[in-house]
Amino acid sequence: MSYIVALTGGICSGKSVVAKKFSNLSKKVSVIDADVISKNITQPGSIALRMITKHFGPHILFSNGSLNRSMLKKIIFFNPKDKEWLEQLLHPLIRKETQKTINILSNRSSYILWVVPLLIENNLQKYADHILMIDVHVDIQLNRIISRDKIHKQYAENILLSQVSRQHRLNYADNVIENNKSIDGMTQHIHNLHRDYLKAEKTTTKKTIFSK
């Protein structure tokens, strides 16, 4: 198995941008994004989407049959039981697809960048060889959420409160990338980490990610 770097961070911390930076450094850096997998397994025609529609009703779909993710996020944010139901449905499917993808990519990857927004919240840190956190000041993060999602400040603040704190997340980090300014300011740090991960890949103990 390839060396697995778990990339995490709070909402609007810049995970996708940083992941893209890493993948651009080498074709042998494979990115596995938990959010992308979640979207793939809930496409029209999927078993997961049929179950979601049955549970929440047909109004959870757009007219073209695709999942209204924005509506779903709001529903589960204000309804803990619905959130728990959805997690029990999706998390095993996401883990299965993640492991399948890792098995496919391992032999042709120098290392795998595993992007997991809720790594700490879901206690998944134990499945990674290295944890890389993207840190951002709360006020900057708040402004990014409001701007991206077009929501009120109070709602954005509640979203932040629903995630683990910066400090709690930092306690698990092996390395931290600060994303408080321009993305270009992180380039050298990313290059240095990439070099370190290439070295680590040569000495890592191979394992199955969800076998612990």
From Swiss-Prot:
Pfam families named among the record's database cross-references: CoaE
Catalytic activity entry: 3'-dephospho-CoA + ATP = ADP + CoA + H(+)
GO molecular function, one term: ATP binding
Gene3D superfamilies, sorted: P-loop containing nucleotide triphosphate hydrolases (3.40.50.300)
Enzyme Commission (EC) number: 2.7.1.24
One cellular-component annotation, GO: cytoplasm
DPCK domain span: 4-204
The protein's annotated pathway: Cofactor biosynthesis; coenzyme A biosynthesis; CoA from (R)-pantothenate: step 5/5
Function description: Catalyzes the phosphorylation of the 3'-hydroxyl group of dephosphocoenzyme A to form coenzyme A.
PANTHER family: BIFUNCTIONAL COENZYME A SYNTHASE-RELATED (PTHR10695:SF46), DEPHOSPHO-COA KINASE-RELATED (PTHR10695)
Family listed: Belongs to the CoaE family.
Protein name, as recorded: Dephospho-CoA kinase
Gene: coaE
